[in-house]
């Protein structure tokens, strides 16, 4: 089936249970799909843009209210939309980091955190992970002292993931922020796997910035994201232009420097807006998501030789698993080699696991029903048993 002459229709979630770690939280709501059709044209949301000519002042569609509501929902003073979380990192780093400045980043952080510092010619120093793959307040304090000794100043910024992308482990953001603020270091909370998935309140956590991903965790089209700030930091990170043309004398009103005036137009922002009521509601049911995740995790644990590498009991639906001692043993002699697992899952209508991966891999159960979770769990057990693995 084709969307048009040379593009196939994508029907992954319509035909399969999707376990892809980066896709499940970004699946669009029906409301977002309809809104995209109506507002998908490039500058459609600018139909009613009037003075002061800024995205977060537009009332039809209600973008002005949306920006206010998102900030309140996150326990922050102000919020802006950005074209993906990485642009939020870039905006914050661009505000505080200059050439040669040290910045602390948790050792499990996404590469875009590092690149946002590199773009400013800053210097990254990592907070080490513990033996059980956590970033702690104690290690943060030690690394801050290391930086002070090395550079003569405290880090200009600290990045911390609430839930990291490698293990899906939850880290002590509140404790880390408390330590950082003793040195007056602003704290950037990376919520790409939490904002839109589970309750997040920046005031309770004590962070200066919250960054969320619309297309990863807020049921929105790509690229989309949220950058929220405290009242103290908002005037810095959302600073307005002071530029004036030397020949023309041109000025540019209250356009914001960090996002080059306006950030999201058309499909990404209306999709984000349209899904927001559903997203606000669904975070209150994260306990149900964890219960469904547990069904799959426990089934995998029953397969002899399988290890859950993420913290256990699980606190998030993203899980890293090591099947070197189970499914990879099958792959050594199977005619399809490592591809036997994804092939067997595919025949059962389950997708999202990297084809060929039978050693260490990740999955995310977010958005599943209990019935689907039970089906996935039973399927893994069936594949294991069919291929001669022991079920405990």
Swiss-Prot record:
CDD domains the record matches: SepCysS
EC identifiers of the protein: 2.5.1.73
InterPro entries linked to this entry: Aminotrans_V_dom, PyrdxlP-dep_Trfase, PyrdxlP-dep_Trfase_major, PyrdxlP-dep_Trfase_small, Sep_Cys-tRNA_synth_arc
A GO BP entry: translation
Protein function: Converts O-phospho-L-seryl-tRNA(Cys) (Sep-tRNA(Cys)) to L-cysteinyl-tRNA(Cys) (Cys-tRNA(Cys)).
Keyword DNA repair belongs to the record: no
Highest taxon in the source lineage: Archaea
HAMAP family: Sep_Cys_tRNA_synth
N6-(pyridoxal phosphate)lysine: residues bearing it: 216
Protein residues bound to pyridoxal 5'-phosphate: 85-86, 190, 213-215
Reactions listed under catalytic activity: O-phospho-L-seryl-tRNA(Cys) + hydrogen sulfide + H(+) = L-cysteinyl-tRNA(Cys) + phosphate
Keyword Protein biosynthesis: yes
Protein name in the entry: O-phospho-L-seryl-tRNA:Cys-tRNA synthase 1
Gene3D superfamilies: Aspartate Aminotransferase, domain 1, Type I PLP-dependent aspartate aminotransferase-like (Major domain)
Cross-referenced NCBIfam families: PRK09331.1, SepCysS
Subunit details: Homodimer. Interacts with SepRS.
GO function term, MF aspect, one: Sep-tRNA:Cys-tRNA synthase activity
Keywords linked to the UniProt accession: Protein biosynthesis, Pyridoxal phosphate, Transferase
Cofactor entry: pyridoxal 5'-phosphate
Similarity section: Belongs to the SepCysS family.
